[in-house]
Regions:
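Rossmann-like adenosine-cofactor binding region
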Residues: 140-175
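Glycine-rich beta-alpha junction loops
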Residues: 14-16, 67-69, 120, 156, ...
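Short, well-ordered alpha-helix to beta-strand connector turns
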Residues: 84, 110, 129, 148-149, ...
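Phosphate/diphosphate ligand-binding glycine-rich loop within oxidoreductases
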Residues: 2-106
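Glycine-rich adenosine-cofactor-binding loop
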Residues: 13, 96-129, 136
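Conserved beta-strand segments of alpha/beta enzyme cores
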Residues: 35-39, 133, 170
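Glycine/Thr-rich phosphate-binding loops of Rossmann-like dinucleotide-binding domains
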Residues: 73, 124-125, 160-162
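Short, conserved beta-strand edge motifs with alternating hydrophobic and charged residues
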Residues: 66, 115-116, 135-136, 152-155
Length: 175
């Protein structure tokens, strides 16, 4: 049961009805015995700033941010990140973090990475991999991933990307 003491975390995106995050996060909160709740909110781009300020004023703990709001979240938050997927509401303002590229810490340093996409997630990987070749669906498509040892797919395209992969290439395929 949600009470006045319950800490609430939001997922902000457009669309978000398909997201499994609320089910996963609420199960994790329950397993840890936390009085926390997680809910998804479908927020259109023109309402994003108002939604974030409303959540902060309502004493939400924070929010996860997904498509198409990661760049706007970075502009609102106290951060140097170009793209933000996590907002923490604090007494002194809104702190922003990006966890998108954290998976890179588990891999060997790539020598020839390729990033597919030009949104917030792709920007987070571009900051972590400044030497990467970048392909966006608006221009350089289909992508040339030949010679890449790491392919980061930050698009909704799957079949074309998978068809272009060869032996020895690592794929990070993001939803």
């Amino acid at each position: 049961m949600i009470t006045a003491e319950t800490r609430i975390v939001a997922l902000l995106g457009h669309p978000v009805s398909h997201s499994l995050s609320p089910r996963m996060q609420n199960a994790a909160f329950a397993a840890r015995g936390l009085d926390w709740a997680y809910a998804a909110f479908d927020v259109e781009p023109d309402g994003f700033v108002a939604a974030v300020h409303g959540l902060a004023a309502s004493r939400f703990a924070g929010a996860n941010v997904t498509t198409p709001h990661k760049l706007a979240a970075a502009e609102l938050a106290d951060t140097d990140e170009p793209s933000v997927n996590t907002l923490v509401f604090a007494d002194v303002g809104i702190r922003g973090y990006s966890t998108d590229a954290a998976i890179l810490a588990t891999l060997d340093q790539p020598s020839s990475p390729v990033i597919l996409g030009d949104g917030g997630t792709a920007m987070a990987f571009k900051q972590a991999l400044p030497e990467a070749r970048v392909f966006a669906r608006r221009g350089d498509w289909p992508p040339d991933v030949a010679g890449a040892d790491l392919v980061v797919n930050a698009t909704s395209e799957r079949a074309e990307v998978l068809a272009g992969l060869g032996a020895g290439q690592t794929l990070i395929d993001l939803p």
